[in-house]
């Protein structure tokens, strides 16, 4: 079977590849930008097309891709999408079920590979506030889906019960993969003092919002009428 990108997916992937190349060769800041694509516009296939295109650019030297979500059902959904299209990816994706398995995969992989995991697996062991560096290569690409939810917590805070200083999971993930390029995908980015999606991942790579999606017929409009009963 064939999978063909819609126009917004095609242009979004093209811009995301350009941003990743810029982060790899020029800025070297690990910020792959934010793809703001509304719910229902095909972000799972967008991620698939992005990985397929990464493989076509020799600058990335057969990158390792880590797809990170914040819950098991979304992790399984994305994994299934990629597994059904493994013929196009030069390898079969793997799903890290346990923290030890994730560490083993990332520490032992020298190039290539697509790993699916949830962000909680990057957390330090109980009672600690540091994590081991798992891979220092710069050709590691992290795709953070629903990036507005868990990609914060870079400043230290103290647990009032234990007195242990801790950080958010996003910092621990970056400590484990310090030279990776991080692409954020979300349908609802956040911009506030302590949570700002753009400040974490870089500026928007491309935007396909609800208005665009409705005009294309990709999603249907939702009407709401308030009533007092």
Language-model-derived ranges and their functions:
Residues 1-229:
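RecA-like P-loop NTPase motor core of helicase/translocase proteins
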